[in-house]
């Protein structure tokens, strides 16, 4: 089992042929590798595990059923 957190991509950029994005987790923003989710772009939501976006998700999945 692993822990992943949902976040929203707010910026995309490339460093040394790696695709990265600034991902917002509420008020906190962190750089995240986006290479594993090539279909995710600014405005999309992803699940992040140890600095890597591992899954492209919907806004409903990101906010949960109670939001």
Can you say where each PLM-predicted feature lies in the sequence?
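Conserved hydrophobic positions within beta-strands
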Residues: 7-9, 23
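Short, conserved beta-turn/loop elements at beta-strand boundaries and strand-helix junctions
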Residues: 12-17
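Short, acidic/hydrophobic/Gly-rich beta-strand patch recurrent on exposed beta strands
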Residues: 20-25, 33
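Short, surface-exposed secondary-structure boundary micro-motifs
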Residues: 51-52
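Short, compositionally biased
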Residues: 56-67
